[in-house]
Structure formats: C-alpha cells, structure tokens
C-alpha cells in the first residue's frame, strides 16, 4: 500500500473506533475493547505510512478521502507520524485493560478523535487546515482532563493561542495570497516571512507545546488525568505545537539569526525550569508533566540550533541540531509513555499518585518496576538508553555552535552545554527520587502493601515501550542516519558527519570491565551475604524510617528558592477576577463542546 492509502486507512480506523466506542459506552468493557483495537490498528497504519516515507526519503502528496482535502507527507513530518503511531499503538492496547477499573470512565471517543485530528494536522498541506485540526485535537484533549476545573485553564489558553494563529494566517493570506505550505515556501524565498507573523506563530504554537512561560495548563491537565490521556498529552498534543513552530521557522529557508537564538534561549529556560519544578513535585503525574516541559525545552534546543545553522549557512550545524532534536522528540515520546503508563499501573492497583503514600512497589509489581526503571534512566539521559542518544547529538550541535562565525553563537554554545548538563543532573536526582521513594523501601500505606501485578495488556504495553527505549539507544548508529532524510535542506556530506554515541557508550563501559570480570570469576571463593533486619540503634524498624520525597528534594529547594518563587508569577491566571468561580469551569466546558461540535460538522460537511 502507498503511504497515502495507509494514512486514509489509519484515519478511517480512528474515526470508526471513536464512533463505535461512543455508541457502546453503556458497556464499559466492550467500549474499551472497541476503542483499543481500533486505535491500535489505526496507529499501526499511521506508523507504517511514516516509516514508508522516511525510508524512501521522498515526500508524497494526495488527498484524504474522509475530509476531502489535500495532504502531504514529507520525511520531516513522517517522524511525527512514526511517533504518533508507536505511542498510539501501546496507549490503545493499554487502554483496553484500563477500562476494567471501577473509577475509570469511557474515553474511546475522545482518544480516537484526538489521534485522528493529530494525524490530519501533521499531514495537512495547508496551514489553515493545520490550525483547525490542531484545534480539534486540543478540544478533544480538554475533555480528557479529569474534571472541568482542571480543563478550564487549558481551554482559556488554547483559545488565546488559536486567536493568535488565526491572526497569523490572516496576515499570511494578505501578504502571500495563499496558505498552501508549498506555495508559501516558494514565495518566501523571494519575500521572507516577517518576524511579526513568526512571533504570532511561535506564541500560538508555544501555548500548545507548553513552552515556559506559556505552560500554565500543562501540570494541571496532567495531574489527575487518566494515564492514557496524560501519555497522549505529552507524546502527541504537545508535539504538534513543536511541529507548528518548526514548520514556520523553515518556510523559505532564510530564517534570520535572532529566530534561532530566541528558540535556543526559550529551550534552555524551559528545560532548566521544567526539570527544577519536577524535582519538588510529589504527585507523580504532575512531576512527569514538568519533566515533559524539560524535554520540550531540550527538543527546542536542537531545533533552535538547526534554525541558527540556517541563518549562519552551516550545513553541519543544521544537521546536528535538527537530527538531534527530531531524534529526541521520538525518544521522549517513547520513554514518557513508559512513565505515564507505568505510573497509571501503580494507581490502578493502589489508588495513589502521591509517591509519599507508596513505597515497596518494586516487590509487589516487579515487571512494572523494571520497566519504570528503564524509563526513568532514559529520562535522565543515562546510556545506553534512547534519552542519551538524542541529547548526545544535541551536545555536538552546541560544540559546533561554539565554533561558528557569529559572536553570539560562540558565546551561547558553551553556556547552553553547561545549562543542559545541569538540567541533566536535576533529571538524575529526580530519577533517584521517584524510583527510590516509590518502588524501594517499605510500603507506607495499606494500599501499597496490598498491591498486585498490573493486568496483562497494561504490563505488556509498558514493557514493550521500555524495550523500544533500549533499542532506540543501542541502535542509534543505524537509526540516526535515517533521520538525515528529514532535514529539509541540501547538506554537504563531508561536513555533516555525526559522531555516533556507540563510541561514547564503549568508553563509558570500559571502567565497568573490571567489575564484570570480578563478578564472573569470583565463584565460591567469597562467602555469600546473609540478610537480616536493618539495624536502627536497638529500636524496632518502623515504616516512617525511610527517606521521603520532600526530604530528598529539600537541598535543591533551598538552593533554588528564588527560582521556585517565580511559579506564581509564571502562572498569574489566578489573579484574574472571577477565575476561581466554579461556574466559569462549567461554562468553559460547554463552550468547548459547542466549538468542537461546530468544527466537526464543518469538517464532515466538507468531506461529504
């Protein structure tokens, strides 16, 4: 099948699954199976379409029969299709068993509509249609938040972003006479994109991507959402915002230097602040949401380095920045899916998202524990996992940036490398905190003490994603060259070599060699260790005698107290008169429903 046929089939499966899951919502288990199987098949078709185009290194165009509008699949947006497809596949399978919980509501309609709209946004050949599909996707996501109160901030900020994007589209139409992306690209080679339109687009799409300080909705939306929904927020919804920013920045191929510098600065702020705020959180989903912000910043660092390379006309910097950013985009979606779904499995058996109320889960849920350890290590960019591979290439782009001709670039290169290293250290601390407090030690509550293994499909989905994280790191030398086809600019092969992380992995592994030999050769010469109760100075061991998440984060909290105090200023919406009113949340929910219904009717009538 051609890539266009695969996409048509995938979108059709998503839509059919959404409708049927809604019709059978009176039977929750059956609705879950319909939504899960349909979503999994649609995701497989989506990933296959992206893989076909990426390996062929040639873009294709055609029509999406269901809505009757032109689409294009380039090697660049094929990476988004692969990301959406892989994550959607395992989230859909996981969602089948998720529906078995008594407190879970049917979500097949919203999840499959979200996936269909996201795919349509990725392949849109018209910027206006891109914005409309992204709007439908975001509205579906609003209804996946746990309640109207937590979704109202997302709705308010999302409508602001849509308004800015609508103004940007109107200005583009006035200036260039079209919103077709191919025509815009050709015309902008003669008349470059104005910085006013670019700023409107970056703010509008930045609200969707959660770039700090436009991130206010992110922790609220993730905190108490269902695990499949939270996973899709981070791996699908926010990544569409990044695609919009990159698309605008690459139009015409003549971006000014300050665009790239602005993206680099925003990326560094988002990465550092997101990692810092994550460390002081104890709700695991809110913590992971802040870590999503950190990784959005890291991806933006890579994309910003690529845009800076365009301005400086340095093909090597373009390749390193874009390839590193795109690879980390894929990798982040994989390991963040592991973490959200793994955290959801723990909630499924314990009813707790506060890690202070857990502990000892590793013995109760060993499969989920090991998969979560892999995901946390990937999040901390530890080798040989996929989180390390993408960041390593981004580090190389900073080294290349420090050797460029522009003074500001030479200044930023070392500073960004140091900033990313500090952010990585915060991620390692957060990994130790989450895994140590949640999965090690003694259970702190009866629910944690009585936890059992997660259901089969939930465990299989989490483990499969963890295996993908390992493959993404170990197979990076073979996967990274494939992404070079996604760089939409002619490159000079002699000047765009990427140092493969495998060499670095071997260098890091060398110090471990003596310990490996000792473990193999020790035999029975050393006495085996005996285990007993922990010694606590003559007192009986109590469950409270364990390190807490609050105590673990306290040194960092004290060291960065001035930065942490900015949280209220970075999210000043609570100061808006009437914002805390309960009626406003319900009003926004109804407005979102009306807007979603209108947009769906328009799209369906267009297809008919």
Swiss-Prot record:
The chain crosses the membrane at residues 10-26, 44-67, 76-93, 116-140, 153-173, 197-218, 229-251, 258-280, 296-312, 416-440, 453-476, 502-521. It holds the Pfam family Proton_antipo_M. It comes from Escherichia coli (strain K12). GO terms for cellular component: formate dehydrogenase complex; plasma membrane. The keyword Nuclease does not apply. InterPro entries: ComplexI-like_HydComp, NADH_UbQ_OxRdtase, ND/Mrp_TM. Belongs to the complex I subunit 4 family. Keywords: Cell inner membrane, Cell membrane, Membrane, Oxidoreductase, Transmembrane, Transmembrane helix. NCBIfam families: PRK08042.1. It comes from the Bacteria. This is Formate hydrogenlyase subunit 3. GO terms for biological process: anaerobic electron transport chain; anaerobic respiration; ATP synthesis coupled electron transport; formate oxidation; glucose catabolic process. It is found in: Cell inner membrane. GO terms for molecular function: NADH dehydrogenase (ubiquinone) activity. FHL comprises of a formate dehydrogenase, unidentified electron carriers and a hydrogenase (isoenzyme 3). In this non-energy conserving pathway molecular hydrogen and carbodioxide from formate are released. It is a multi-pass membrane protein. The keyword rRNA processing does not apply.
